């Protein structure tokens, strides 16, 4: 596929993150999985037990002619709490920490600029990590498009 770019964010439970991004015009596909850990092909169980060092992430393939990386960053910042280490709501553990994984120097610079803007406007310390993307490991199939499959679930973004 040509003319696409990839963005990866960790912002708590990957089910909610995927549901948010998959509906955005310009997003071609989303997939949930794990990034940033120290073992190959981790299972959900290994990640949840804190044995792998991975973060739950949403992998987003998008068309940069329709959707800008800055727009994705804005959705990232506005739809989770970047001030709580290793936690999002009721979900607690390092796998739920706030992360931006970048693929290019441009993404890194845009992420850092957005981080500074958010920090400037926040009374609390922003704990989001900005890290170079590493291997992405897809989560098990039952995690993919979870809320879409469970069409009786209601999410408010």
Swiss-Prot record:
A Gene Ontology cellular-component term: cytoplasm
Database matches in PANTHER family: MITOCHONDRIAL PEPTIDE METHIONINE SULFOXIDE REDUCTASE
Keyword set, alphabetical order: Oxidoreductase
HAMAP family in alphabetical order: MsrA
Keyword Calcium among UniProt keywords: no
BP-aspect Gene Ontology terms: cellular response to oxidative stress; protein modification process
Catalytic activity of the protein: L-methionyl-[protein] + [thioredoxin]-disulfide + H2O = L-methionyl-(S)-S-oxide-[protein] + [thioredoxin]-dithiol; [thioredoxin]-disulfide + L-methionine + H2O = L-methionine (S)-S-oxide + [thioredoxin]-dithiol
Family statement drawn from the similarity comment of this UniProt entry: Belongs to the MsrA Met sulfoxide reductase family.
Active site: 13
Protein name: Peptide methionine sulfoxide reductase MsrA
Entry GO MF terms: L-methionine-(S)-S-oxide reductase activity; peptide-methionine (S)-S-oxide reductase activity
Main enzyme class: oxidoreductase
Function: Has an important function as a repair enzyme for proteins that have been inactivated by oxidation. Catalyzes the reversible oxidation-reduction of methionine sulfoxide in proteins to methionine.
NCBIfam families: msrA (TIGR00401)
Cited Gene3D superfamilies: Peptide methionine sulphoxide reductase MsrA
Keyword Glycoprotein: no
One matching Pfam family: PMSR
E.C. number(s) listed in UniProt: 1.8.4.11
């Amino acid at each position: 596929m040509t003319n696409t770019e990839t963005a990866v964010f960790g912002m708590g439970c990957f089910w909610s993150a995927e549901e948010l991004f998959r509906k955005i015009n310009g997003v071609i596909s989303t997939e949930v999985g794990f990034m940033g850990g120290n073992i190959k092909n981790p299972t959900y169980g290994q990640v949840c037990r804190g044995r792998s060092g991975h973060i739950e992430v949403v992998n987003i393939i998008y068309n940069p002619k329709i959707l800008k990386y800055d727009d994705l960053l804005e959705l990232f910042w506005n739809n989770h709490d970047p001030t709580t280490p290793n936690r999002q709501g009721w979900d607690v553990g390092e796998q739920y920490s706030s992360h931006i994984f970048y693929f290019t120097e441009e993404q890194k610079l845009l992420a850092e600029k957005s981080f500074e803007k958010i920090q400037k406007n926040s009374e609390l310390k922003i704990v989001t990590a900005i890290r170079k993307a590493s291997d992405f490991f897809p989560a098990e199939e039952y995690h993919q498009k979870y809320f879409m499959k469970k069409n009786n679930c209601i999410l408010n973004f």
